[in-house]
Amino acid sequence: MIGVFVNSKHVPYARKIVEGNKLYESRTKNTLKKLVGKRVGIIETGNGYPMIVGEVTIGKARFVTKRMWDGIYRALSCVPYGSEYDASGEGKWCYEMKEPIPYDEPIFLPKNAIRHGRAWCEFDI
């Protein structure tokens, strides 16, 4: 399985994704482009050991200008104004989070997970 890391230290972004409340995941770089169209696990990080909290299908990737971000995508991404994840400079990459399914019980990320940079990994469960 493929998993995407979502920092949830201050805001439960990973849970918001799998519960269907966070419709877009945003990144400063196009780090999830290889995952568009794939079913992935959402890995909650920032609160101890990484946990897989559910699954989504990653939809279209689009570069969103700062103006578009401020107009609509900030709200769809559940990112508060002034947060460390707020858009700066030219804008951000936004990925649709489709068909979310939360797990009844989170699963510990296996220790043998193969990381692909800081954005995602592969593992067997």
Task: Describe the residue ranges of each PLM region.
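Structured alpha/beta reader/binder surfaces that contact nucleic acids or chromatin modification marks
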Residues: 1-125
